[in-house]
């Protein structure tokens, strides 16, 4: 678990799959992602199982959670992909699937936590993000 001021990043769980399906089938959420919709529960389960088979040093997807009252609410996912340990690079990815949490700074906090994790704990030299020029939130 990676703790921030108002958020935490945790390993994804099988119980998260229904949220993934809902998010990945929402065109507003996926408009800047390279994802083909519609996605089924079975497709997300297969993706999840593939993530479990991947060694953590090759990249990992983490759930973004915010604390509301006395519970943590899963609002999105972030991760490092295509980790190259020889060249010490990785691609960064993030999605805030719960639209009620857009434009509140949670994505920026999650980004900072993942970058810190990548540089300080994985000893990476370069972390990059491919961004559509029409995605202003990703460029902040």
What are these regions (language model features)?
Residues 112, 116, 139-140:
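Core alpha-helical elements of the protein kinase catalytic domain
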Residues 72, 105, 135:
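Conserved G/P- and acidic residue-centered "switch" motifs that form tight phosphate/ATP-binding loops
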Residues 1-100:
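GNAT-family acyltransferases
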Residues 120-130:
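Conserved GNAT acetyl-CoA-binding A-motif
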Residues 108, 133-140:
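Conserved active-site alpha-helix within GNAT-family acetyltransferase domains
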Residues 12, 117-119:
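Conserved hydrophobic/aromatic "anchor" residues
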Residues 101, 105-114:
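Conserved acetyl-CoA pyrophosphate-binding loop and the N-cap/start of the following alpha-helix
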């Amino acid at each position: 678990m990676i703790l921030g001021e108002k958020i935490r990043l945790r390993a994804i769980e099988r119980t998260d799959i229904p949220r993934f399906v809902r998010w990945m089938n929402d065109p507003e959420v996926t408009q800047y992602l390279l994802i083909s919709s519609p996605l089924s529960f079975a497709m997300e389960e297969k993706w999840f199982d593939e993530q479990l088979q991947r060694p953590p040093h090759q990249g990992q997807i983490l759930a973004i959670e915010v604390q509301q009252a006395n519970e943590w609410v899963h609002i999105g996912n972030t991760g490092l992909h295509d980790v190259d340990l020889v060249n010490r690079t990785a691609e960064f990815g993030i999605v805030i699937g719960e639209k009620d949490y857009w434009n509140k700074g949670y994505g920026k906090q999650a980004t900072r936590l993942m970058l810190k994790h990548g540089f300080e704990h994985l000893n990476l030299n370069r972390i990059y993000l491919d961004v559509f020029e029409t995605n202003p939130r990703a460029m902040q």
